[in-house]
Amino acid sequence: SDRIVRWDGERLQIAARSTAENVDPAYLADFRTISWTAPDGSQVFGLYAPPSNPRWQSPGLPPAFVQFHGGPTSASWARFSAEASYFTSRGYAWLEVNYRGSSGYGRAYRNALRERWGEIDVEDALGAAQALAQQGLADPTRLVIRGGSAGGYTVLNTLVRHPGVFKAGV
């Protein structure tokens, strides 16, 4: 629903609208595909959105969120993302990692995670951090890794097995 309502025990009243009708597109996350090479030589793919606030720019490279989808064999696609837009409009970069095992890149890519979940996805988390730095897209000292469900498992494994690569995990 697009309304914030108030209930006084007898009547329901619209207190406010929760969505703006005229959001300036300059503040929305604008995804583009990036890729990097995994240790086994295969390409790994992600969707990168740079900071999107025309009235503010980070001094130097921006901090970044590195997002892992659930599944583990789901995938992230370019789309409107309120969550990504919230952070990119506040000066953060945003990367959604389609780690090896994600759908949409062919059978071999999808099967790469088979019997190696907790290894391949973690390699790709480290590769994502390295790619953001090497491609000049984010400050490698200000990276946050995040994910839910299977992505949360990747976050935990990465933080425990490779402390210091990411400054925080969600």
Model-assigned labels for residue ranges:
Residues 2-6:
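Structural motif
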Residues 18-141, 146-149, 157, 161:
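Cap/lid segment of the alpha/beta-hydrolase catalytic domain
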Residues 8-10:
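Short loop/turn segments that connect beta-strands within beta-propeller blades
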Residues 1, 163-164:
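Proline-centered flexible-loop/turn and helix-kink motifs
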Residues 164-170:
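A conserved short beta-strand
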Residues 152:
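Residues forming the Rossmann-fold NAD(P)(H) cofactor-binding site
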